[in-house]
């Protein structure tokens, strides 16, 4: 039985990955977003739940932690954002992950975050004493999503996935936007850009937030671009369809945009077998 502590747990994709791999676990999560917790509780009733990571101390645990997982908020680090880095309160939470790793001394650890300025990357690497591995979700799903993974879990080679699209996806993705005038040029792309927590507000085809209208896939019937449905976003994240049902679509998009990509985490966790 593996004792797992997941910080900034979100919708518990790490738990889903462990369970799908058949790795028996006692899973403890720390999360404060009520909508993410709602999704997690619906899918994983056996999780032991804590609250704010800033209130957690090593003495809270009777048993050693075998695996420490974290995907600390990345908005301040993101190259697409304001790039406040560690000065951003959300990104500064990575220091809580580092603190608990030092206090708990887990056998294995995994920290995920977005691509960031070199100085921020160096700080995390020096604190964890390991260099990150960059993995794009495009090797596992139909989404281009680059993320950095700091871990001491041995990671095997990645074989690019092959996609078979059904009638709903037959022409792949056709990003296009409208403002108040006619539609802009529609282009074909084999993969969708990075799904973000702000997708419900609309995003650009390259994954950056879009503040006017939305891009998504091309609707053959209505003959214009539409947003992806929450179910399609679940597919892009490698999750079972309906995993995030039970909350509003806005919160589903947000929770999915903040989540791990399941097949990527499964690939990493295969090193625990």
Labelled PLM ranges:
Residues 2-55:
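SAM cofactor-binding core of SAM-dependent methyltransferases
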Residues 51, 69-70:
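Redox-cofactor binding/interface segments in oxidoreductases and associated redox assembly factors
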Residues 56-67, 74-227, 232:
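Class I S-adenosyl-L-methionine
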Residues 71, 197, 230-246:
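Glycine-rich, acidic and aromatic/proline-enriched surface loops and short helix-turn segments
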Residues 265:
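Acidic-aromatic/histidine active-site loop/patch
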């Amino acid at each position: 039985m593996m004792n797992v502590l997941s910080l900034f747990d979100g919708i518990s994709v790490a738990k889903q990955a462990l369970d799908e791999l058949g790795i028996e676990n006692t899973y403890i999560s720390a999360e404060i977003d009520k909508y993410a917790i709602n999704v997690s509780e619906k899918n994983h009733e056996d999780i032991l739940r804590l609250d704010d990571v800033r209130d957690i101390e090593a003495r809270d645990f009777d048993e050693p932690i075998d695996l420490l997982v974290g995907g600390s908020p990345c908005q301040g680090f993101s190259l697409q954002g304001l790039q406040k880095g560690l000065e951003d309160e959300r990104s500064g939470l990575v220091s809580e992950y580092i603190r608990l790793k030092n206090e708990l001394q887990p056998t294995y650890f995994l920290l995920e975050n977005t691509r960031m300025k070199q100085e921020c990357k160096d700080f995390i690497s020096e604190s964890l004493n390991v260099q990150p591995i960059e993995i794009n979700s495009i090797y596992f799903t139909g989404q281009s999503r680059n993320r950095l993974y700091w871990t001491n879990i041995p990671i095997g080679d990645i074989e690019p996935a092959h996609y078979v699209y059904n009638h709903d996806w037959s022409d792949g993705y056709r990003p296009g936007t409208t403002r108040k005038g006619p539609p802009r040029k529609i282009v074909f792309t084999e993969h969708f850009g990075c799904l973000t927590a702000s997708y419900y507000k609309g995003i650009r085809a390259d994954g950056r937030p879009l503040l006017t209208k939305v891009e998504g896939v091309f609707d053959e019937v209505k003959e214009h671009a539409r947003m992806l449905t929450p179910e399609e976003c679940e597919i892009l994240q490698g999750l079972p369809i309906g995993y995030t049902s039970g909350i509003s679509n806005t919160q589903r998009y947000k929770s999915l945009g903040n989540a791990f990509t399941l097949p990527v985490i499964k690939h990493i966790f295969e090193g625990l077998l």
